[in-house]
Amino acid sequence: MDLNLHLASYLYLTPSKFYIQPLDAPKEALIIDRQTCEITVNKIFSKDYLPKNVASRIIDGIIGIKRLISGVYLIVISQSKLVGVINEKPIYKVEQTSIIPFNENRYEPGSGQNQWETTYLAMLESVLRTPSFYYSYGYDLTNSLQRNFEQTVECQSRGVYYVGHQYYDRRFLWNQHLMIDFERCGSITDRYRLPFILGFVCIKEGSIGLNFNWSIISRRGTRRAGTRFNSRGADFEGNVANFVETEQFLECGENFKASHVQIRGSIPLLWGQKVNYRMKPPIDINPHDEQCLPLKRHIEELKKFYGDVSFVSLIDQRGHEGQIAYEYSQKMNRIQQYFIVPYHHFDFHKECSKMRWHRLNILLEKIQPEIESQGYFALLNNQVVNSQNGIIRSNCIDSLDRTNVVQSMIAKRVLEAQIDLANNGLSGNIFLNENFLYTFKNTWADNADALSIQYAGTPALKTDFTRTGQRTHYGVIMDGINSLTRYVANNFFDDYRQDAIDLFLGNFEGHPSPLYKPLSIISYTSLVPAALILFTLVALYLYLR
């Protein structure tokens, strides 16, 4: 569904108001009162109304408004870069944001409120620095191509030709909480409400008998968002940690568009892991008798959005993951009394041990009938020629490394079928084209790294296989370094990251509390030296032992 949002704007700052004047509608302005937070739209605006020498800047969009202890803040996109074009609409990646106080004199210097306000602002800034926020003025990134098209048909049947905020998929809308003040104003602010996703977007060009654009869009869920050991499993409503919808998008010329959607998410049971300075903390499974309830609600939600659901679990059947593998299998068997839900368990580490990565084809052949029956979505001359009526849901223990390997292999098979349909079977095997094969593998590996940094604090493991098709000694060494980096991040910094995410999403409001004051705001790159030192010490110990 096409959006009709305002583009970049001038932001004028007077002592009493913010004025946001769209570059594409210079006679209009959104006005925010800095004292009362009242929001209005002036349709006959002129800069002449403003004081001379008024402070101004150009912004790319509004993320929203956030209330903290001592004041209110306007959050805007101050810099972004073009990623590419999807469905003829530009897609942007956020590069820099600004948090602007409504009241410059919001607290007394040196007061306790000052300390907490500074801490909470640092938390917000740490989330906004996550290098994977995306938006578009013209295309709704919260929805897949299929959902967008279905909404377009529905709206046009009612004489509506642009979607409003009510069609955004709030599961993936990361600034929903920050847009509450705008929603209270009704439709007058619709064109200023920029849907803002966290995840990964990459757009590439290719050619094999025909020119095409190929994209990956990953949308991270908001309902149980968080960090690796702080956000595990499901809640009683069926929301799961690390829930991500990944869409592979294909455009051939002006007439053919296709997409295929997969999802990943934590094992949908009540379980968790508490950090205890071990590399692999013990898995605590809630003994609650109602373990099937969150699983049932999770499946109901998936069926509502996607249709048929097939579960693929890649965790170990023995050892550290053995008990939860058993519980998962038992509950999936019990849930069959409510739904017919295919469940495939593939012990990734056992089956692919000793570099036997070709054994992944065993899993792919097993689920191939479901991939084919679920289908993919395709449009030819704006007419539906295929629909996707189901979803493959993959997970490992983190739903990161093993999951991404399998998702990329499923995506490869689907893309072959889509290209074949687009070119009436004349294109041949797209993956015989070495340039595109390289692009495909590396883009899926980049997707893995982005999602892993968001959840675990480091790039993904096993991406050497995704990038090259085989395991390498270099890849094994990098996995060791990233594993140790995860250890440092998860044990020493993730509580702060979790609090920051919860504050950003509105899961708790800023107020003084016994939270520790963070020593510093850290990034992935600052953890690498610590991990290298640990890795060197472990290697020396093993060598000298």
Positions of PLM-derived features:
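Phosphoinositide system proteins, centered on phosphoinositide phosphatases
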Residues: 1-385, 414-545
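A phosphate-binding catalytic loop at a beta-strand-loop-alpha-helix junction
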Residues: 390-409
